[in-house]
């Protein structure tokens, strides 16, 4: 959420240099320039966007590929990975700082504060969220130097649908943990405010009886922006090594 495929620019280059073909498809209404998306706020069309529509767009894309892909996603994209993998639409999945599936919630203050733009019961569900810099600092970029926070905010952040944010509470985000599926790696940052590592670990534990490979890895001191913050190569490298051993 709040991002476009541009946030994967370094990861795409990293994996391509190592022989992989990459795709970073935009969510519906997230494919235009950052400035254009900001200028359109508040967009009624964006306000109506749902998690179900995002999943449908990926199902359609995957159906047209010559082979099933490796799936990698961050935050709400991590939940998308879990849901698509449960449908057998990938050969392996990596869910980084993943939003929780239906039935899982955190009551940690950092989770509530970071997600308040979505959780606020008085907010109009049809009005997109335009995350402020201070909200981004707390929820995504805690621990980073302010110039780096400002640069990330300016380059990557876009308005987002509240309805997408509420998606994990709906049946669209329901997972059958008794069904076999391809291998899944869940990654968490110990300093993540918006998706605390305890929430990611609880997510991992839900798969305890799933007849499939499920692994969990925490990165010490990493925040929610671990896919692009300095040192992102450590996370990408671990992901690559895991995939080489799991996506056969």
Q: Predicted segments — roles?
A:
Residues 1-36:
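Short, surface-exposed "cap/lid" segments of acyl-processing enzymes
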Residues 52-69:
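Conserved acidic catalytic loop of the alpha/beta-hydrolase fold
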Residues 72-77, 81:
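Gly/Ala-rich beta-loop-alpha elbow adjacent to hydrolase catalytic centers
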Residues 89-124, 163-171:
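Flexible "cap/lid" loop of the alpha/beta hydrolase fold
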Residues 158-177, 181:
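Active-site nucleophile elbow and catalytic-triad environment of alpha/beta-hydrolase enzymes
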Residues 180, 186-188, 192:
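Short beta-strand/loop motif that positions the catalytic acidic residue
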Residues 182, 196-206:
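Short alpha-helix in the alpha/beta-hydrolase fold that links the catalytic acid
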Residues 213-248:
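Catalytic active-site module of serine/aspartate enzymes centered on a nucleophile-bearing elbow/loop
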